[in-house]
Amino acid sequence: MMMRDGNISGPKKKKFTTKCRPFSFYKNRHIIMLINDESVYLYNLTLKPPSYYISSIVGQFYKQDNSTKNAQQLVLVSSTTLQLFEINEEAGKLELQSSQNLLGIINSIEKICLSEVDGVVITSDSGNLSILQYDNKTKKFISKIQEPMTKNGWGRNYVGENLAIDPENRCILVAAMEKNKLFYKIESNSSGSKELSSPLEAHSKQVLCLKIVALNTDHNNPLFGALELTPEKKCIINYYELDQGLNHVVKKKPNSSNSDPLPNDVNYLIPLPGHIGGMVVCGTNWCFYDKLDGPRIYLPLPRRNGQTQDSIIVNHVTHVLKKKKFFILLQNALGDLFKLTVDYDFDKEIIKNISITYFDTIPPALSLNIFKNGFLFANVLNNDKLLYQFEKLGDDLTEGELVINSSDYESLNSVRESVTSFKLKGLDNLALIDVLETLSPITDSKIIDSKLVTLSSHSYVKSITHGVPTTTLVESPLPITPTDIFTTKLSLESANDEYLVISSSLSSKTLVLSIGEVVEDVEDSEFVLDQPTIAVQQVGIASVVQIYSNGIKHVRTVNGNKKTTDWFPPAGITITHATTNNQQVLIALSNLSVVYFEIDATDDQLIEYQDRLEIATTITAMAIQENISEKSPFAIIGCSDETIQVVSLQEHNCLEIKSLQALSANSSSLKMLKSSGKETHVHIGMENGVYARIKIDTINGNLSNSRVKYIGSKPVSLSVIKFSNEIEGILAISSAPWISYLYRDSFKITPLLEIDITNGSSFISEDIGGEGIVGIKDNNLIIFSVGKEDSVFDPSQDLTIATTKLRYTPRKMITNGNRLFISESEYNVQGPFKCNINGDVKENVDEDYYEAFGYEWKQNSWASCIQVVDSKSNQVIQSLQLDGNESIVSMSAVSFNKTSTPSVPASHLVVGVCTNQTILPNSYDKSYLYTFKIGKKHLQLVHKTELDHIPQVLENFQDKLLVASGNHIRLYDIGQKQLLKKSTTIIDFSTNINKIIPQTNRIIICDSHKSSIVFAKFDESQNQFVPFADDVMKRQITSIMNLDIDTLIGGDKFGNIFVTRIDEDISKQADDDWTILKTQDGILNSCPYKLQNLIEFHIGDIITSFNLGCLNLAGTESVIYTGLQGTIGLLIPLVSKSEVELLFNLQLYMQQSQNNLVGKDHLKLRSYYNPIKNVIDGDLLERFLEFDISLKIEISRKLNKSVNDIEKKLIDLRNRSAF
């Protein structure tokens, strides 16, 4: 793959393309494929799914085998992904159990009670009503019911917009925003499974449905409350009752005594539990209880003391206690939680009083969930998700705390006129115990040193690195320079390691340390200390063997006394390599002989096998299975002829070579490990920095199904390590340490971060809290654990996120050397910071207060600033607060009269701002350009330039500032007091330019409304830009990037990705024959030439940035994109015709074989607005890895490939540029 930067010109223009023969045909059975040499073929993979969770629900979705309690789980659903978590009560953490890409766009989700466990009901763009149940064996949701209810796609009449389920599980209501409502009765068949009846229709013409809730009616007919809007723009409440006897839907209106007109600021409905029924209707600063044929009960909503902000309820959660008691937590848009309780007279069946008290303040959430075991999950809006634990229920109110009683209010007017305020307080009833890191929303990103740096969540810079964090526990110097390190326990029953053995081949010494509360020398180990140790192993019941260069020292403990036995090789012969487990010892001698020992189970003695194996070449490494209860049936021996040999250790053919495998280099380290009680793999570290894993058949010793990964420039050393009781893995050390492990049938290999060791060993000790790793670096001993300091190792997470807190919502990021310039603006917010663009100002701002309670809201107000972040230390080094009510709309680094390159940073930073800007309707008072000088340490204001237009786009073009607004493009140069206008161009057929990519003497213009993409060249004779080519398709573009000088990739606001290119001859003519080209007349109010459309693909998320690069070591350069909802994806160029053919045909068979959980056709999903073109969907293809073996074989036979070939291709594609 060859790519050229758009700012580099030259005589040749190399294309972003694949090397395929032109118009080649491939025929496999009935499939014919056309491949064009000029086309681009990409492979799409989702590296991180969207983390904007539209809903969260709690239920018992599966039963735990060894639990007597009815444990609850949490389901989080984004637009495309369904995830299931459970709470580890001991660690206080959320643990991911399952994550599924539904390959569809989810609209809403609710819980439904199935026969023994809970399931989920989903409405999606497939037009089906889907009921899913979790299968604990496969760790996946499976489809139980797919009920078609409407056509594919979205619309005002799409009935999946609102979803409500009767609390007694008798009926499901789905409703469109306009007109359509469908009622499905839930019935049980003879086998006890749930079925849906034919739908009953209830249409309301010319009425918009804003919200629907299912009401509790005990055993009466199912009833639903709806908030609706009439053509006169008046809000009304209607009730819909399903008459089960007549099988008919009845629309009912509130009691005549409750016919007071609703204020138009009503926004939320809250149903009450069964014995009470009815619902709470909420508006701005008020609420009332409403029940069909019952009186209304009014209450005001509390407001923050000393602030003018309204209290608007946006969220709630109901929790039922014992003896029919319950409480409801209401949350307003500011994040304040209020506890609503009802004093109910069971004898008279009336409500005596409703009270509201202030509970706590947490970040505003989309949904709240309470677990029976006392946890509260907050699905926080635009930030990390939070898990709290209840410390108390807020019943112990002190004197002076606010209590609102309904008995004090008689009408809606009295409630609306009342002002009830409360004083904010820190968390009192809740305690934060866990944070679920998310990226939504991502507004911009850059790749810096293989890290993806994003502007994401609410006011953060988040650096995403492939790797697992580590926590250093102990680091101390050693008296020798170590080359190897070992740990061992002294008896079979011991749970902890007791000896730490450090060997030095440089000084021919061995150091034995005891492991306990303190680490100290062992005086009575009986080990040989004046020679380097090759291996140490606890064998038998209570014995330890030390293998060193000149022999084996066997130390047995008998009745508390230590007895030693020595074994020596022949004179002049030394031991070079060894591998051991509790029952077997295998050593290699310098005369190329292999000697095998077994442990006598009766007295722990070493028994030498009489025959020896002679190897023809030098032995480089060897391994037998470790940490197993039985004997290893095979040994693996690495030889200097770049092969490994499988040697039998079974009685009938001991030391017989069974198979041989060629390698790409000599093996430097070998390990054999049984994975999750299923398959056994040989792990190979090679001298060229390659790590490989090969499956070994434990019956006949055959090797197959290899996986390779380049992990560094140095020879790879391997050690078996233990992460937990369930997971064992490999520590692989090259130029950096990595770990590999199998987790839920998925093999992961991940670098370790923030640690540098040259050798390591597993380390188990209660003093460090369990499993750890002990390593050496130079003359230092390092003990560390895998995972963050405050958490245990999570095998499902192989990405580490480092965060830097910002002030406001970040908009754009510019890299300039080692610094990041970040523009931040937030609407309807009044910032507490003072303007300091003209110099430093003393601040007295309690940032912890605003972090907890947020900034004060103010209508049509803006808070904006520029912050400078050091990309290496992730620290904010400068913050510039803007003056007054200014909003930042654009920013660019510019080199006036100086060429900017990655090694020569830009000289100035220009920021475009507007004053008193409003959105919907869009307006502003004035606009300016702030010009800052980029110094070595800080930004310094040079001058301020007033404009007569909004600076929508700023870019650096030919050492000048390019400013675009509407359909105008202007060039500015720097002056002493302000920027000086040098050129003006009007693009007649554009209306709203929102992106520009500068090239050497050309620019690529993007329009968000009309003309889509335009290529234009700067004509020096006319002193303006002349457009000469544009796109045939009109798009509303959100992000764009050059692939080469003629090819670009972009995304639009509807979630589509496209690649377009200008014809090579037209591009060459624009460079060589510009005089002729610029005189060509346009066609139909557009350019004379059109772009070629190469790629079309629907992602389902709004693309906010593209980057060229890779996220792994020595990977292939690919396109990495980010989405607004937190999506991170990868587009890998396919480089051969055979690769494209194989993946294309595999995709066809996968489309036929896979059952979509929501009933969405894959081709329709990826062709939402335009037919899919030249993109292979890796998300679909990787489901092949999850299929059962019979289906894998069926598909592979159709492709004339083996299952291993297809699996290897899919894994290699992922490893090509990512992880």
From Swiss-Prot:
Keywords linked to the UniProt accession: mRNA processing, mRNA splicing, Nucleus, Spliceosome
Function: Involved in pre-mRNA splicing and cell cycle control.
Encoding gene per record: RSE1
PANTHER family, sorted: DNA REPAIR/RNA PROCESSING CPSF FAMILY
UniProt-listed GO biological process terms: mRNA splicing, via spliceosome
Name of the molecule in the record: Pre-mRNA-splicing factor RSE1
Transmembrane region(s): none
Cited Pfam families: Beta-prop_RSE1_1st, Beta-prop_RSE1_2nd, CPSF_A
